[in-house]
């Protein structure tokens, strides 16, 4: 993740705006750090509760397994947030050493890719359940979901290797140690030839991260949920608005939470003007914090009427994270047989 590396831009933005306009702008680092600490506290408690419920209080199904790993990726992300917040508060000064610089940022990258891939896997699993029910009944099992989860974690780890290679600490000769990407892979940071090579490597990493970590998964999610919604409507499987709400929530939350981060990464790559960098960084921090903390809550409360929560939190979890009802599954199988 490049958010730690980008805080230098925020500090420079505040200074340059103050010098050019004479009007001091509030330093956003305190607000950003406070948001990260708040997200950490809420995220650890809420995601920890979700993991406990999904693991010990619910039936082991494809949906609950995939949601468990999705929320596990959110939980891992929240554990890194205090270290990011500390770096922001110290003007991007990294005090945790080179090894943790690599470890924390590669871990954030793994959890980012994993969360995106699990959201895609959930949409694909529902696609097969509704459009190919016979195949799903034979092959869509908890064991199948476990293998998918393992493949996702391995893929996310492989795609995060660049952070282990390029992430390093660097002395800026101003009394600060920065944890940032060194795409030059050299101690000669000032060499023009090395900087050109580093720019190309940076661009390749950005394109790969944008395509594999946002655009392609987003298209997969839209395609799957569009086909699922159409099929369920045709076969009269929409007994309530619950499935539709969950689908819409998945698409909207995915786009809103991740688009600002990739926009900011693109602006950093193109060395955009300070103000857009300043604004998109703050927005990216807020939306990513929102994603790790609030997205599971959105799934929960769009899954069933809020009144159910007053009766039983477990019933609410079951209505949200379990597969479609046996009646709906039977109707789908019958429809498939007729076809």
Curated annotation (Swiss-Prot):
- According to its UniProt entry, this protein's organism is Mus musculus (Mouse)
- Please name the CDD domains in this protein's record: 7tmA_GPR33
Question: Which residues form each disulfide bond in the chain?
Answer: 101-179
Q: What is this protein called?
A: Probable G-protein coupled receptor 33
Q: In which tissues is it expressed?
A: Expressed predominantly in lung, spleen and testis.
Topological region Cytoplasmic: 54-64, 125-143, 231-246, 304-339
Keyword terms of this UniProt record: Cell membrane, Disulfide bond, G-protein coupled receptor, Glycoprotein, Membrane, Receptor, Transducer, Transmembrane, Transmembrane helix
UniProt similarity note: Belongs to the G-protein coupled receptor 1 family.
Query: What's the domain of life for this entry?
Result: Eukaryota
Its membrane topology, per UniProt?
A: Multi-pass membrane protein
Q: Which residues span the membrane?
A: 31-53, 65-86, 104-124, 144-165, 210-230, 247-268, 284-303
MF (Gene Ontology): G protein-coupled receptor activity
UniProt keyword Disulfide bond, yes or no: yes
**Function text:** Orphan receptor; could be a chemoattractant receptor.
Its subcellular locations are: Cell membrane
Q: Which Pfam families match?
A: 7tm_1
Q: Does the keyword Transcription apply?
A: no
Q: Which residues lie on this side of the membrane: Extracellular?
A: 1-30, 87-103, 166-209, 269-283
Q: Which residues does the annotation flag as glycosylated?
A: 5, 12, 19
Write down any Gene Ontology CC term: plasma membrane
């Amino acid at each position: 993740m490049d958010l730690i590396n980008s805080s230098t831009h925020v500090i420079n933005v505040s200074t340059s705006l103050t010098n050019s306009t004479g009007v001091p702008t509030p330093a956003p680092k305190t607000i950003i750090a406070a948001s990260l600490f708040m997200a950490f506290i809420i995220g650890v408690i809420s995601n920890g509760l979700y993991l406990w419920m999904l693991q010990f209080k619910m039936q082991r199904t494809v949906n609950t397994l995939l949601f468990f790993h999705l929320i596990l990726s959110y939980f891992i992300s929240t554990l890194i947030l205090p270290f990011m917040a500390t770096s922001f508060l110290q003007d991007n000064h990294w005090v945790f050493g080179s090894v943790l610089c690599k470890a924390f940022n590669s871990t954030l990258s793994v959890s980012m890719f994993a969360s995106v891939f699990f959201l895609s896997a959930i949409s694909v699993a529902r696609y097969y359940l509704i459009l190919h029910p016979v195949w799903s009944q034979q092959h869509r099992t908890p064991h199948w979901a476990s293998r998918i989860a393992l493949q996702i974690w391995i893929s996310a780890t492989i795609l995060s290797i660049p952070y282990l290679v390029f992430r390093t600490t660097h002395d800026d000769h101003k009394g600060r140690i920065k944890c940032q990407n060194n795409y030059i892979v050299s101690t000669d940071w000032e060499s023009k030839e090395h900087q050109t090579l580093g720019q190309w490597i940076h661009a390749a990493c950005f394109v790969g991260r944008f395509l594999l970590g946002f655009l392609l998964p987003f298209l997969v999610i839209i395609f799957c949920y569009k086909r699922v919604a159409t099929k369920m409507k045709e076969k009269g499987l929409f007994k309530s608005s619950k499935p539709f709400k969950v689908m819409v929530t998945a698409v909207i939350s995915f786009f809103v939470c991740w688009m600002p981060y990739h926009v900011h990464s693109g602006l950093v790559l193109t060395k955009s003007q300070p103000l857009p960098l300043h604004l998109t960084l703050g927005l990216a921090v807020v939306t990513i914090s929102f994603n790790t903390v609030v997205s599971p809550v959105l799934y929960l409360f769009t899954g069933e009427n809020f009144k159910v929560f007053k009766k039983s939190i477990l019933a609410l979890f079951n209505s949200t994270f379990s597969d479609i009802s046996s009646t709906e599954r039977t109707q789908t199988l019958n429809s498939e047989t007729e076809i």
